[in-house]
Every structure is written in structure tokens, then in C-alpha cells.
UniProtKB/Swiss-Prot annotation:
Transmembrane segments: none annotated. It is found in: Cytoplasm. It comes from the Bacteria. Belongs to the EcpR/MatA family. The keyword Transcription applies. This is HTH-type transcriptional regulator EcpR. It comes from Escherichia coli O127:H6 (strain E2348/69 / EPEC). GO terms for biological process: positive regulation of DNA-templated transcription initiation. Changing V176A: Lack of activity.
Length: 196
């Protein structure tokens, strides 16, 4: 009898999440169907590990997929998307190449936490940990992008050349290349590949 109750509850919860989240777009990007479906199912799956109701999560949270396909958009418009989610509990889901950027935004804005989506991690526990408000600065194990590196990343994403960046930042071209190299090491990729 209890397995039927559990099944019924799970079905009801899953149905609730799928119906309700379409209009509110609490998972970004809603156009990434696999991420959207996978994260919706994960949240339902960890229902017993989280303290908040699914309705509250749907209403108050925004889950953002920071993958290589969406990084350029987030880099170019970080002030816009940060303003758009103001007042919400923002959870960044970071792929390996975006971990340092996720850490930057965590330190420099009002982000609730970061879920690192590496293959060896238990994403269910990490997601519950962040939703429950337990993610703290001490939980960040990886490097974060510095303010200067972020400025150079933004300008590179806009198509600016190192010489122009150096003139704007009032530094040498060599310094621009040093900051780019440092950012690339933290992002595990060349900047031009990430921001195309």
C-alpha cells in the first residue's frame, strides 16, 4: 500500500512541476529541453531532501544552466540578467568550463549557490545542499575569475582586440595577454572558443 502512495505522490509532484513551471520559467534556459526536463526531474527526485515546498521553489528560485553554449550571452549581458533575477534565489548549474565564472558571479552578486555539474559529483546532494541554503563561500574549491579578468573577458566577447583592451584598461598589451592566459587557465579553454 505504501509504494502506491509514494508513486501517487511522486506522480502528483512531477505533474505539478511540469505544469506550473512552463509559465514562470524558473529554469533557464527553457529552450534547452534536456536540461529543463532533467533538472525538473532532479528537483522532484530530491523532494525528500529539501526543506522547502516545490511550490516555493518554483515561485522563488531561478536555476540557470551555465554551459558553453550560453556563456557568451551571460558574459555580454551579466548586468541585465542579474537585474532580471533580482529578488529570486538564483542557483547556477556550472559545467567544468564555467565554474570559475559561476564563482565570480557568486562572489560579486546575490547568488544563492553554485551546483558543480562535474561527472564525479553527486549532483542530487549538491542541489539539495544549495536549495537548503547551506552553500557558503568555504564550499568554493575552484578559482574564481578576478574583476580585471572579467573585464577582459567581456571586451574579448565583444570582439575587441588586445591593443584596444589595453588602451581602455590603461595597461600594456602584455598585461592583457597575461590576464587572458590566467582566465583561460581557470576556464580550461581559450577565450575565443568560449565567446564565439
Amino acid at each position: 500500500m505504501t509504494w502506491q502512495n509514494d508513486y501517487s505522490r511522486d506522480y502528483e509532484v512531477k505533474n505539478h512541476m511540469e505544469c506550473q513551471n512552463r509559465s514562470d520559467k524558473y529554469i533557464w534556459s527553457p529552450h534547452d529541453a534536456y536540461f529543463y526536463k532533467g533538472l525538473s526531474e532532479l528537483i522532484v527526485d530530491i523532494d525528500r531532501l529539501i526543506y522547502l515546498s516545490l511550490e516555493k521553489i518554483r515561485k522563488d528560485f531561478v536555476f540557470i544552466n551555465l554551459n558553453t553554449d550560453s556563456l557568451t550571452e551571460f558574459i555580454n549581458r551579466d548586468n541585465e540578467w542579474l537585474s532580471a533575477v533580482k529578488g529570486k534565489q538564483v542557483v547556477l548549474i556550472a559545467a567544468r568550463k564555467s565554474e570559475a565564472l559561476a564563482n565570480y558571479w557568486y562572489y560579486n552578486s546575490n547568488i544563492r549557490g553554485v551546483v558543480y555539474a562535474g561527472l564525479s559529483r553527486d549532483i542530487r546532494k549538491e542541489l539539495a545542499y544549495v536549495i537548503n541554503g547551506r552553500f557558503l563561500r568555504k564550499d568554493i574549491k575552484k578559482d574564481k575569475i578576478t574583476d580585471r579578468e572579467m573585464e577582459i573577458i567581456r571586451m574579448t566577447a565583444q570582439g575587441m582586440l588586445p591593443k584596444s583592451i589595453a588602451r581602455i584598461e590603461n595597461c600594456s598589451v602584455k598585461t592583457v595577454y597575461t590576464h587572458r592566459r590566467n582566465a583561460e587557465a581557470k576556464l580550461y579553454s581559450k577565450l575565443y572558443k568560449l565567446v564565439q
